[in-house]
Amino acid sequence: VLSSQYSSLEYLDGMNFEVDNETFTLQLVHFLANDFPTDVQELGSLTGVLIDSFDTSALSKAQIRCLTSWVTAGGSLFVGTGTGAEVVLSGLDHLLKVQAGDVEEVQYTFKSELSRAGSARLYTSGLTFAEEDKWESLSLSSPACVYREKYESGEISVFTFSLTDDTFRQWTGRDDVVGEIFEEELREEAGRSWVGDTSLWYVKTTLYAFMNGRHPNTFYYGIFFIVYLG
């Protein structure tokens, strides 16, 4: 995940989820965008990348190619839009083929299984999908707020709102909805043979390489999240 509003996403750090009798914890790693890799091998065993409230035009062509290759090989990309949709999508046109539209407040009613969710009024971007037949809307809310596409061996999810939205962050149903958004990826994570001490060491080693290559005066910030068994 890349974000210029890291502090507004800190609520995700340490969030626990129960999926298929397994406990998962989201752990955020904050890094500078200039350190986003250009070699897909440097992404190692990261479970997912979230881009939210970030100007993707700041990424180089080599970084975009790396991200695309990582998703193609089986990675999961999550993209938050909302009021920042235009800048978030600006550098991802070739990968997503999604255009930002007008932003308006939309009242979402979430499915009854999300006991604490109920409804929420969120700033929402109208999204236009050039390849609409490749996307499916999740049966999470009415109207739909999450769209998902299978991309080769990987997966891309686009939200009509931003996870940095103040209303969403303060909403009592927040954690339930976040869990639903990431549930499929977490379930796949539970079945991956590399989840264990050895793979966790590999992830930490990869992150160590990122952290030792930082440039201190870069304006854009980001986060990677790692999901591991608790």
Regions found by a protein language model. Give the residues of each.
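A glycine-rich, often tryptophan-bearing local segment used as a flexible ligand/cofactor-contacting loop or short
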Residues: 56-142
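Short secondary-structure boundary/capping segments
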Residues: 15-19, 92-97, 173-175
